């Protein structure tokens, strides 16, 4: 694995990421959520993609793609591992969203190219990174109150907002993916909350990917 070449690709791609608002349809009619996981000991990459109406946030379509994993797990290079399955799920959608929430990092990445930025750039679609763990940068400790907020900083640059979406839950790291500003990324996530730790797009993507009870109930009601 030529990591030097991949690192150079990341730096080059990151320079093309658009960090300002460029939504073609604002407000959006459809928002997607995307989640990637692995099966069979990492041999299979699974990507789930859901479509929700906005502002009702009702699930109207979902697709799950499974493909052979083409790259080993290497921290800092996960987008190269996850992107092919995301693309496969994206291509199955009968209609394309105006905005995509990706479970993962956007520009809050050492080389400013997490999976949300990589996917958004390749598809030229507005994306937001909604990550559960910090990958780089520093932030001031948050209070325990829901709504507590702090900028994630690295080398004098704000990479994300660190936001406690729910009491007694770890915060989310919300960042520009592509064609969405940092502040707008936070605002869109806040508009898509319904009382859970995760915003509805990535919560539903996780539910579909893992066949959680909420998705099983949804299937039963939509047969």
Swiss-Prot record:
The keyword Nuclease applies. Disulfide bonds: none annotated. It is found in: Cytoplasm. Mg(2+) binds at residues 35, 103. The record marks 73 as: Interaction with target DNA. It catalyses: Endonucleolytic cleavage at apurinic or apyrimidinic sites to products with a 5'-phosphate. GO terms for biological process: DNA repair. Its main location: cytoplasm. GO terms for molecular function: deoxyribonuclease V activity; magnesium ion binding; RNA endonuclease activity, producing 5'-phosphomonoesters; single-stranded RNA binding. It holds the Pfam family Endonuclease_5. GO terms for cellular component: cytoplasm. Its cofactor is Mg(2+). Its EC number is 3.1.21.7. Keywords: Cytoplasm, DNA damage, DNA repair, Endonuclease, Hydrolase, Magnesium, Metal-binding, Nuclease. InterPro entries: Endonuclease-V. It comes from the Bacteria. DNA repair enzyme involved in the repair of deaminated bases. Selectively cleaves double-stranded DNA at the second phosphodiester bond 3' to a deoxyinosine leaving behind the intact lesion on the nicked DNA. Belongs to the endonuclease V family. This is Endonuclease V. The lineage of its organism: Bacteria, Pseudomonadati, Pseudomonadota, Gammaproteobacteria, Enterobacterales.
């Amino acid at each position: 694995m030529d990591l030097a070449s991949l690192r150079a690709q990341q730096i080059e791609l990151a320079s093309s990421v658009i960090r300002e608002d460029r939504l073609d349809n604002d407000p959006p009619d459809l928002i997607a959520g995307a989640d990637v996981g692995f099966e069979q000991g990492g041999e299979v990459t699974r990507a789930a993609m859901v479509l929700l109406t906005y502002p009702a946030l009702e699930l109207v379509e979902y697709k799950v793609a499974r493909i052979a994993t083409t790259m080993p797990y290497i921290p800092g290079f996960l987008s190269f591992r996850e992107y092919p399955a995301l693309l496969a799920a994206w291509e199955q959608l009968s209609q394309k969203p105006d905005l995509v929430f990706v479970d993962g990092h956007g520009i809050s990445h050492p080389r400013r190219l997490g999976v949300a930025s990589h996917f958004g750039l390749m598809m030229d679609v507005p994306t937001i990174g909604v990550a559960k763990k910090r990958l780089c940068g520093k932030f001031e400790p948050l209070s325990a109150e829901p709504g507590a907020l702090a900028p994630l900083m690295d080398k004098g640059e704000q990479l994300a907002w660190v936001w406690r979406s729910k009491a007694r839950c770890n915060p989310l790291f919300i960042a520009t993916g592509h064609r969405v500003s940092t502040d707008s990324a936070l605002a869109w996530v806040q508009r898509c909350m319904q009382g859970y730790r995760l915003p509805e797009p990535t919560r539903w993507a996780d539910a579909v990917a893992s066949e959680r009870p909420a998705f099983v109930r949804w299937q039963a009601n939509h047969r």
